[in-house]
Amino acid sequence: MTDKIVVAALYKFVSLPDYQALREPLLQTLLDNGIKGTLLLAEEGINGTVSGSRAAIDALLAWFRQDARLADIDHKESYCDEQPFYRTKVKLKKEIVTLGVPGVDPNQRVGTYVEPQDWNALISDPEVLLIDTRNDYEVAIGTFEGAIDPKTKSFREFPEYVKAHFDPSKHKKVAMFCTGGIRCEKASSYMLGEGFEEVYHLKGGILKYLEEVPQEQTKWRGDCFVFDNRVTVRHDLSEGDYDQCHACRNPISVEDRQSEYYSPGVSCPHCWDSLPEKTRESARERQKQIELARARNQPHPIGRDPRQLNEA
């Protein structure tokens, strides 16, 4: 395993009034150790996924341990053969995961953490309302048995869905989950603020569950979407068979790639009839540069991802 790239998903909700001052030393630590990926800093904490050698990730964790506030940062590891990120970034944000509701602060109030080994028993309770807090394209390729899919396009839509579909007086027990634990932790803080009394969330998220719960005992079905070039991981955390459309961000299956509407890097069956021409042209140009760099055995070209045109 020593020659594998270590992919570390990490976050912690913690008060960081000096978060702006942390950016440069954190970025320098990443660069000094050849670590790729993106970390977000905000007054409410830190969040992100990075990758590098075993020694590099250990050096980053050692850097966090120098600050008592970050010493016990939650992190989950998986492995891959190739670097899943192209860039190294540390960004300053208002929120480390954007819910968009003022006053929601997991540093002040949060639901009950549930360890992966206790999760199956909880969600088997018929009185428990099980909610997947991820986006629709993530849920489409894998989720837990019996989970409700809010069909959200972004986490910002989650509060509206809750208000429209759930009632604290009727739904006494709520359990939520997400990829690495951060969205469901923040969602639990929001739900408590809305008057829901028993709110639970999966500690470490789906990734920790897949790491710790034996496959023969799993209640997980499908693959888990991840926010890097692996696109998805299986129950053993190995890379899945999905690719990702660079135009709409949807995961695309082997069957999708056989479609007449699939054009590598440009469009897929999910978006071919809805993409603005500006986005399509940007995607074509980006794909051309990628193929040219590949033919010359050069690094992936650094440029704006056309997906971001729809993410303003």
Curated annotation (Swiss-Prot):
Gene Ontology MF terms in the entry: oxidoreductase activity, acting on paired donors, with incorporation or reduction of molecular oxygen
Start and end residues of each stretch annotated as Disordered: 279-312
The keyword tRNA processing appears for this protein: yes
InterPro entries: Rhodanese-like_dom (IPR001763), Rhodanese-like_dom_sf (IPR036873), TrhO (IPR020936), TRHO_N (IPR040503)
Compositionally biased spans, kind Basic and acidic residues: 279-294, 302-312
Disulphides: none
UniProt keyword Manganese present: no
Matching SMART domains: RHOD (SM00450)
Keywords from the named record: Oxidoreductase, tRNA processing
Catalytic site: 178
EC code: 1.14.-.-
Pfam family, one: UPF0176_N
PROSITE patterns xrefs: RHODANESE_3
GO BP: tRNA modification
Catalytic activity of the protein: uridine(34) in tRNA + AH2 + O2 = 5-hydroxyuridine(34) in tRNA + A + H2O
Span of domain Rhodanese: 124-218
Function: Catalyzes oxygen-dependent 5-hydroxyuridine (ho5U) modification at position 34 in tRNAs.
PANTHER family according to UniProt: RHODANESE-LIKE DOMAIN-CONTAINING PROTEIN 7-RELATED, THIOSULFATE SULFURTRANSFERASE/RHODANESE-LIKE DOMAIN-CONTAINING PROTEIN 2
Similarity comment: family membership: Belongs to the TrhO family.
Record-given protein name: tRNA uridine(34) hydroxylase
Species name: Ectopseudomonas mendocina (strain ymp) (Pseudomonas mendocina)
Taxonomic lineage of the native organism: Bacteria, Pseudomonadati, Pseudomonadota, Gammaproteobacteria, Pseudomonadales
